[in-house]
Each structure stands twice: as C-alpha cells, then as structure tokens.
Amino acid sequence: MKKKILLMMSLISVFFAWQLTQAKQVLAEGKVKVVTTFYPVYEFTKGVIGNDGDVFMLMKAGTEPHDFEPSTKDIKKIQDADAFVYMDDNMETWVSDVKKSLTSKKVTIVKGTGNMLLVAGAGHDHHHEDADKKHEHNKHSEEGHNHAFDPHVWLSPYRSITVVENIRDSLSKAYPEKAENFKANAATYIEKLKELDKDYTAALSDAKQKSFVTQHAAFGYMALDYGLNQISINGVTPDAEPSAKRIATLSKYVKKYGIKYIYFEENASSKVAKTLAKEAGVKAAVLSPLEGLTEKEMKAGQDYFTVMRKNLETLRLTTDVAGKEILPEKDTTKTVYNGYFKDKEVKDRQLSDWSGSWQSVYPYLQDGTLDQVWDYKAKKSKGKMTAAEYKDYYTTGYKTDVEQIKINGKKKTMTFVRNGEKKTFTYTYAGKEILTYPKGNRGVRFMFEAKEADAGEFKYVQFSDHAIAPEKAKHFHLYWGGDSQEKLHKELEHWPTYYGSDLSGREIAQEINAH
C-alpha cells in the first residue's frame, strides 16, 4: 500500500512538472498581444516585439493624440491585452484614468518615456540663463507649478533610443521567456536609430542657420539635441488664412530676419501658402510631428525612418543657408521670475509664505538623481559649460548639512534639522533687500532675525524664491549666518535650496529640468 501511495505521488509530481513545462512552452511560443496608443509608440513597440507578438494601434491617422479620448471599445481592447504601451502622461493625458478603470491585473502597462526627464511645454519655460558662474536667481527652477511638460521626445532620434530601451526592458521583465528575442530585436532597431542620429548630427552640427520657425512647437528635443533653436509663432495654421493684421506683423518679422520658410505640421492649403508667399514673402514647408501614418502610407513603405529623413531634408532648406540669428517675435525672458521688475512692485512678505516641511536637494545631487538635469543644461548652454561643470557649480551652490527645515508661519518659528538634531528659533521680519546681479537682472532677499540670543549661525536668515510679493513659496534658496544681514547679501556662491518634503527626488529633478 505504501509503495502504491509513493508511486501515485511520483506520478502526480511528474504530471504537474510536465504541465508547468508545457505552460512555459506555450508562453514562450505564444504571441503577446500588445495595444499601443499612437504611431511612434506602435512603431517602437513593433521594433521590440518582432514576431513574438501582435501589436495594435488605438489611434488611426488623422486622430489628434493630444485630444483623443478612448471609447468603451478602446478600453476593452486594453483590458483584453497582455500589455499596453503609451508614450507619456503628458501626451496621452487620459491614460491615468484608464489605469484606474482596468479590472484585469494581467495587463502590463509600459510608459515609453520611463524615468526620462522632460522639458517644459511651449509657453511654460522660464528661459533661465544659467551659464554664468555667478548665481543670479534666474538659474534655478520653480517647484510645484502645474507645468505642461513636452512629451515629443520621439522627434529626436537620440531620445528615441531611450524610449525603445524602456519598452524593451519593461516587456523583457514581464515576459522573461521572450526577453532574449526582445533584446535582440531592440538591438537591431536601436542600431537604425543610431544611424539616423548620426545623420542628423552630421547634417546639423555645422548648420549655417541654427534657427527655424515653426507653427507647431513639437521639435524642442530635436532642436536641443542637434544644436538648433526652435522658434514657434502664433496666429498661423495650415488650414486657415491668417488675418490681415497678422500678415502685416508677420511680414515685418520675416523681412527683419530674412526668414525663407515657416514649417507646418501638415501641407498648408494652397490659399494659405499663396497668401504667405505673396503678402509675407515666406514659403510654407512641412515638418511632420509623426503622430500618425495612414494605412496607405505604411503599405507604401513609409515608416519612422523615412519620415524623419524627409524631415531632415526639409529642415535643411533653412539650416543650409547662412543668415542672421533669428529671435522670437516677443522677448519672453524678461519676467519677474527671471529678475526683471520695478522697485514699486516689491512688497513685504511674512514667514507664513514659507510655512511647511522642506527638504534639501543636496542629497539628490550627491546620489545622481539630478544627473539628467546637468545633461540638459549642458545642451541648452550650447557648449558654454559641460554637464560635469554644471554639476560642480551646483554642488557648490546646493551644499549643506541642514537636511530639513520646518517652518511654522503662525508661531513664526523655524526648525533646522542637522544629522537628526533639531534647533528651533522664533523670527521677526527684518525687511527686504533688492540685489542687482552682473547681467542686469535682480533678486529680492526677504530678511528675518531670530529673537533668541543663542541662535548662533541661524541668527540671520534670508529667503529668495524668485517672487517679489506675498505668495506661497514652492521652493526657496536660504542664506543664514551669525554675523549680519549685510554680510549675507554678499553671498552669491552658496545657496542651499529646499523643496517640499512630500516630493520625491525625481519629481524635484523634473521640475528643475522644466526651466
């Protein structure tokens, strides 16, 4: 009897082992069903999946990805898929709601941008100029604003490589049995992207004209990565004839800078093109944002690479012709945030403007969380400083051992936390000081003085947060010392910086990078 039981147990073990092997084999041999959002995501995902899955695209050509809202049928497709791949929450803004509605936990959700930091969307950049070695308060980012981040990373071959790597890594983790194939497919696709990146670099690195004018500000990453300046204009669309007033101002702008082409996202109607040519003396050309290809175009052999090479060819209509530097129609850099204001606009502020719990950004600089920021800054400086030089510069500025500060506006107290040890003092407002920096911009220091005689190095403190009147701070630079307010006014190299304690390091890095 005992032998029969042992035999039965052995047979059962063999059966289950066989079933497990079969299940793994089915998973390895079966195809993964992947739903993607719009064309670049579809293209990149197919490049990774290869023959190991079926890839579907929700948005067809002609659909505006920015305005798309999924139907019940679309959500059902996502629900029934093995994986769902999208670009970024700033592009497909509806994805966060769809995630919440998914009842199936088997769907692997992949964000193409992964942990990439993005730049601010059009109209949200504060245009900081931070290549100077002196801290002029137009060098740092503001935290906590509801910025629209620019998601158009796929229009830069250089950044598209990272998107493909993110898709590869996420799908490989979800389907380890297919990881080897995914990695091999991705490697082949990435090689093609690297070749495209080389083509863009070769054509644009020595461009005779670095600026191009576009109606659709989608090419910021492409411009950044290849040393160009994207200048967007308002009041001109490919399908609506501009007003007489707009034509008049545009004509002056075009003549002032010798602009030959304005780039549109699609073919401008013949009427619009003729009006621009006749009245403003400028031609219309197409730079595709690659948000969709028709079935006909794909069957004809068009894909990401053919369209991107066509974009490069069209862009060279401008970049291959020498001309004066083209500036935006309006100077958006001279803002209060950047240090341009009138004395009468500066108002007194109370400690309550900085109430809350704050963390130093210095640890995030040390652990590499901010490294992407330095890379971006180096590219924005166009060779004036390297990423390593930026990191050194901010290391000096951010350095502090006061890791946390808690401010109670009602009690008018500040608690400084150093190595876990807390020191709390009560402060009174001591006025404001307007400082003028070498480039001509200015900043305001709001001064406070501790009541306690034993406050020591925390006797005098000064806040600077790019604001000049009462408002709730989103981040701040803090100066402190035990000698005098006047001595602190001279401190321009060292500015410990603090953000809300509820923010992650990546969230802080993203906000810094958006400016």
Curated annotation (Swiss-Prot):
Pfam families: ZinT, ZnuA. It comes from the Bacteria. GO terms for molecular function: zinc ion binding. Keywords: Ion transport, Metal-binding, Signal, Transport, Zinc, Zinc transport. Residues 129-148 are annotated as: His-rich loop. Disulfide bonds: none annotated. CDD domains: AdcA (cd01017). Residues 1-28 form the signal peptide. Residues 125-148 are annotated as: Disordered. Zn(2+) binds at H66, H152, H216, E291. GO terms for biological process: cell adhesion; zinc ion transport. Belongs to the bacterial solute-binding protein 9 family. The His-rich loop facilitates the closure of the zinc binding site and is required for zinc acquisition. Part of the ATP-binding cassette (ABC) transport system AdcABC involved in zinc import. Binds zinc with high affinity and specificity and delivers it to the membrane permease for translocation into the cytoplasm. This is Zinc-binding protein AdcA.
